[in-house]
Swiss-Prot record:
Pathway membership, UniProt: Purine metabolism; AMP biosynthesis via salvage pathway; AMP from ADP: step 1/1
Name of the featured protein: Adenylate kinase
Function of the protein: Catalyzes the reversible transfer of the terminal phosphate group between ATP and AMP. Plays an important role in cellular energy homeostasis and in adenine nucleotide metabolism.
Similarity field: Belongs to the adenylate kinase family.
Keywords of the record: ATP-binding, Cytoplasm, Kinase, Metal-binding, Nucleotide biosynthesis, Nucleotide-binding, Transferase, Zinc
Length: 216
């Protein structure tokens, strides 16, 4: 089964991706991971991508597409895959569909984990990490015994720059601009499956399993 995973930052995609990957025995392919692997292994594609990233530029669609296609050609993808972080644009989605059609395959489902902005802000801006040992906390969901102090090492808990309200709102705006056309694209292909991401993680996964079971 070939699955695309869509959803805003803070929607819990990573958690669900791990569960889906285990249940359906398909690799969870994160574009961030395959970029890092190509750069670490100094592949020609990785070095080309690094040249853009070092200048603070976006990696062009064509190069991103080639890196993803290269990964999808590996043996562990023969029975399907779960793509997370790709496609980000309609152009990338069209290139993926063309690649799959050439292999007599297709996108089976585009899962959209939907979470309202207020809840994402609560989830992400409430995150805290220990400045000493890196342990994770949340001011509402995973609280330390003593406010602002790590249970494990006594270090000071801090908010990462990525988790400030301003940064989260910027990321949500970028996501909205990028993803809305993709949502329409997959809706028109009749493969978009929207799920309520506000539920507890096991309930979200149960709903995902039900909708995937209906098409599998």
């Amino acid at each position: 089964m070939n699955i695309i995973l869509l959803g805003p930052p803070g929607a819990g995609k990573g958690t669900q991706a791990k569960l889906i990957s285990e249940k359906y025995s398909i690799p969870h392919i994160s574009t961030g991971d395959i970029f890092r692997k190509n750069i670490s292994n100094k592949t020609p594609l990785g070095m080309e991508a690094k040249s853009y990233m070092d200048k603070g530029q976006l990696v062009p669609d064509e190069l991103t597409i080639e890196i993803v296609k290269d990964r999808l050609g590996e043996e562990d993808c023969k029975n399907g895959f779960l793509l997370d972080g790709f496609p980000r644009t309609v152009k990338q989605a069209e290139a993926l569909d063309e690649f799959l059609q050439n292999k007599s395959s297709k996108t089976d489902a585009a899962l959209l984990i939907d979470v309202p902005q207020e809840l994402i802000l609560e989830r992400m801006t409430g995150r805290r990490v220990c400045g000493e040992c890196g342990a994770s906390y949340h001011i509402k969901f995973i609280t330390p015994k003593t406010e602002g102090v790590c249970d494990l090492c006594g270090g000071k808990l801090v908010q990462r720059k990525d988790d400030t309200k301003e940064t989260v709102l910027e990321r949500l705006e970028v996501y909205s601009k990028q993803t809305q056309p993709l949502i329409e694209y997959y809706k028109n292909k009749n493969v978009l499956l929207a799920l309520d991401g506000t539920k507890e993680k096991n309930e979200v996964f149960e709903n995902i399993s039900n909708v995937l079971g209906a098409i599998n």
